[in-house]
From Swiss-Prot:
Species this chain originates from: Pseudomonas entomophila (strain L48)
Gene Ontology molecular function terms on file: rRNA binding; structural constituent of ribosome
InterPro entries membership: Ribosomal_uS15, Ribosomal_uS15_bac-type, uS15_NS1_RNA-bd_sf
PANTHER family documented for this protein: RIBOSOMAL PROTEIN S15, BACTERIAL AND ORGANELLAR, SMALL RIBOSOMAL SUBUNIT PROTEIN US15M
Family according to the record: Belongs to the universal ribosomal protein uS15 family.
Alphabetic keyword roster: Ribonucleoprotein, Ribosomal protein, RNA-binding, rRNA-binding
Gene assigned in the entry: rpsO
Role description: One of the primary rRNA binding proteins, it binds directly to 16S rRNA where it helps nucleate assembly of the platform of the 30S subunit by binding and bridging several RNA helices of the 16S rRNA. Forms an intersubunit bridge (bridge B4) with the 23S rRNA of the 50S subunit in the ribosome.
Name of the molecule in the record: Small ribosomal subunit protein uS15
Subunit-structure text: Part of the 30S ribosomal subunit. Forms a bridge to the 50S subunit in the 70S ribosome, contacting the 23S rRNA.
Length: 89
């Protein structure tokens, strides 16, 4: 249940720091958050899909690592990002 090309492009355009920026922590966290939210809906209908659940846990861990990195580098960008995404960290 991956994001479509249009959804990815919209998220990248919304969170990029400069034109063509796809690697900044903000963009990566926003893409992971969108994937995680999409998978949560999948698990409501498919409770026994343990293989995909492993992928979900991996995405959550990767997002946590990126957020920890951003918090250490620039706390104002970190605070702004979790506010925009509605995360509860």
């Amino acid at each position: 249940m991956a994001l479509s090309v249009e959804e990815k492009a919209q998220i990248v355009a919304e969170y990029q720091q400069a034109a063509g920026d796809t690697g900044s922590p903000e963009v990566q966290v926003a893409l992971l958050t969108a994937n995680i939210n999409k998978l949560q809906g999948h698990f409501k209908a498919n409770e026994k899909d343990h293989h995909s659940r492993r992928g979900l846990i991996r995405m959550v861990n990767q997002r946590r690592k990126l957020l920890d990195y951003l918090k250490g580098k620039d706390t104002t960008r970190y605070s702004a990002l979790i506010g925009r995404l509605g995360l509860r960290r």
